[in-house]
Structures are given as C-alpha cells and as structure tokens.
A protein has these predicted regions:
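C-terminal beta-strand-loop-alpha-helix "lid" module of Rossmann-like NAD(P)-dependent dehydrogenases
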Residues: 1-286
C-alpha cells in the first residue's frame, strides 16, 4: 500500500496538472470563440459563390471548361488539413482513419505538421507542405489553390479532394473528404438536373457572357472553398482542444478527490491504531 507521503505527493502533482489543463482550456475557449465566428461568417459568401457557379453551369457546355470536365482516371491529389499541435482529442486520429481508406495513386498537399508527419511516415508522396497559422487569412490559401489548379489543368491528377474536419458545433466535428476538382461531380450533376427547370424559369443575365464570367469566378471559387475549409479546420481544432482540456481538468480533479479520500482514510486508520496502542499500553500499566 502507498504511504501517506506518496499519496500526498500524487495529489499535489495531479492538482498542478489540473491547473495547467484548466489554463489551456481557457486559452482554447478564447481562440475557439474567434475561430467559430470566422467560420460561421464565411459560410454565406461560400454559399453565394457556390450558387453562382451552379447558375452559370446551367447556361454553358460544362465539358468545355477544364475545371468542370470530369475524368475517369484514378490519380488523385488530396489537400490534407490537420493541426500543428496535439492535445485536440481524437481530431487528428479521425482524419488519419479517413486517409487510410483512400485508394488509387494519390499525392498530398498538407497544411499542419501532424498531417505532414503522418504522410512522410506512411511513405506517401508529399507534393507540398504549408504552415497553418494561428490566425489564417486568404493569403495562406493562394499557393495551395494554385498548386491544386495547376496539377489538375496539367492532367497530372484526375481529381482533387480535400480532407479536413468540418465544424458543426463545439461538441461535434466530423472528418470529411470531398471532391474539389472537377467542380461538377456526379452528385452535383443530379442536383443541377433537378434545378434546371427553376433556372430556366428564372432568367439570368451574365455580362459579357456566361463563359467569360465562369473563367473569372472559377479560380475565386476554388480559393474561397479552401479558405472556408481552413476556417472550419481551425474552429474544429480549438473546439476539440477546449473540450479535451475541459475533460482532462475534470478527470484530474476527480482523481485528486479520490486520492484525498484515500489519504484521509489511511490517515484516520493510522490515528485510530495509535489511539488503540496507547489505550492498550495504558491498560497494561494499570
């Protein structure tokens, strides 16, 4: 059985750990609030430009535009957004599980140290690695978007996918992999077919013409999609870290309480034993 001194030392150590995790929880909570606001505020613009692409797609020959044209090959480029630091619960491990299910010839662009280390360790082809700043802006996304578009237009890859953690709420973040290029996939084609009548009934005017507008909008669309993904990845990271640190603090506090009860029980038992020894000795002396 552990001695009183050992238990007391453990209580102190665990209490100090709880203080550290609580401080990290508060820091993560402050960052989480800002990141969540940025991710939420970016969604309306992302939806608007997405709707614009859909509207134009109903007025043009989709196969004539390289960023819309579909390919039957299996060469893929995956843009993988992870975190630079750990202590974010199961966030990165969920991403790694999604990644392991990928098949075919795959290249990777990574943003986040955890992801780049995993790719290198797995022996996969790493095309480029980018830092993911604490407060990302759209400038961070430009080189990522450029490489993705260039690789696709040069036909070095047949599809471009993004793997990231989609932000839903503080308690829910989901590892998601979805197609970025070509922009029109099978699912969107079905949706466009059902929306065609609505678009025809609602006349749209594109100046100077739909093709010219599309040429200008498509690169901006890719850039904004990547930027929105970065914002959601950051919101997910800070949310997961805040929850993980909160759980760690609560677990440490519970363990410290249990050890305190054990400490008090052993101490009380020792005191009772001493009293009994003194009483026994006193009776023996009478």
């Amino acid at each position: 059985m552990a001695t009183l001194r050992e238990i007391k030392r453990r209580i102190k150590s665990i209490s100090n750990t709880a203080k550290i995790t609580h401080a990290m929880e508060l820091v993560a909570a402050a960052k989480m609030k800002r990141a969540q606001e940025s991710a939420t505020n970016g969604k309306p613009y992302s939806k608007l430009i997405n709707d614009t692409i859909r509207s134009i797609a109903n007025h043009i020959d989709q196969a004539a535009h390289p960023l819309l044209a579909r390919s039957q090959g299996d060469k893929s480029l995956v843009i993988f957004f992870s975190t630079d630091r750990g202590l974010a619960g199961s966030l990165n491990s969920n991403l790694f599980r999604e990644l392991e299910e990928l098949v075919g010839k795959t290249k990777f662009i990574t943003a986040g140290k955890k992801g780049s280390r995993f790719i290198v360790k797995s022996g996969k082809e790493l095309l480029a690695d980018f830092p993911l700043p604490e407060k990302p802006d759209i400038a961070v996304c430009r080189p990522i978007a450029k490489i993705a578009i260039d690789e696709f237009l040069k036909k070095n890859v047949d599809q471009v996918h993004v793997l990231y953690t989609e932000f839903t709420s503080t308690l829910k973040q989901t590892a998601v992999i979805r197609q970025l290029l070509p922009i029109i996939d099978e699912e969107i084609l079905k949706e466009l077919a059902t929306e065609a009548e609505e678009f025809q009934a609602r006349e749209s005017l594109f100046e100077p013409n739909p093709d010219t507008v599309l040429e200008a909008v498509l690169p901006q669309y890719i850039l904004m999609e990547i930027y929105q993904i970065v914002l959601e990845a950051k919101a997910s990271e800070h949310s997961a870290r805040m929850v993980a640190m909160k759980n760690a603090t609560e677990n440490a506090s519970d363990l410290a309480e249990d050890l305190t009860l054990t400490y008090n029980g052993i101490r009380q038992e020792a005191i009772t034993k001493e009293i009994l020894d003194i009483s026994t000795a006193a009776i023996a002396l009478e």
